[in-house]
Amino acid sequence: NYRKDNLEAPEIMYQPELGKYYLFTSYDPLMTTYNVRVAYSDFPEGPFVDFYGEDIKDTTNNVPILTAPYRFENHPGWAGTAHCGLIDAGDGRYFMVHQGRLSPQNQLMDLHVREVFFTVNGWPVVSPERYAGTAPRSFTKEDLVGEWEIIRIQEPPLERSLEAGQILWGEGDLRNGEQALSARVVLEADGSVGDATWDFNVKKQLLTIKT
């Protein structure tokens, strides 16, 4: 966990329906590739394990990653998307708040709010865009037909020279490859998407793409 010399901002949340404690932590330099990761445990004192069952107290590089620098089209994008807090809305919904820095200079810090959802195997994921207070609704397969932008959140590929866990003075801009960029895909009505196929489970509201 110390491969990039910065690991901080722990936050623990209990999810009573799943009976799990979730530990959210922030990795990497706060102005650039700052990102949130999560692990879970049956007990608040741990041990906490990652997606692959690895104890996060080890020095491996743990996943899953919930937020990392990203950019959709027609927007300059965000960096420094970490240092989170968790909110229990009291009605079965959960939200994550964290900082975000407007690219490309990454100087202006803004507050991001994202809704937290849980996968069928008990892992939290967050909304790809900031929460806008819209009412929840269900979708049909027909609703999803059309062109979409998809972003894959993944490990920042570059290693920086750091000082006290932070980037060196004057190196606050993101470098090539450090920001996840959106790619356009078209979900066709016949269930194809490029060379792959897609399907949508209406009951679970779950989109599946098979390559």
Predicted regions and their residues:
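Carbohydrate-active catalytic/glycan-binding domains of CAZyme proteins
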Residues: 1-211
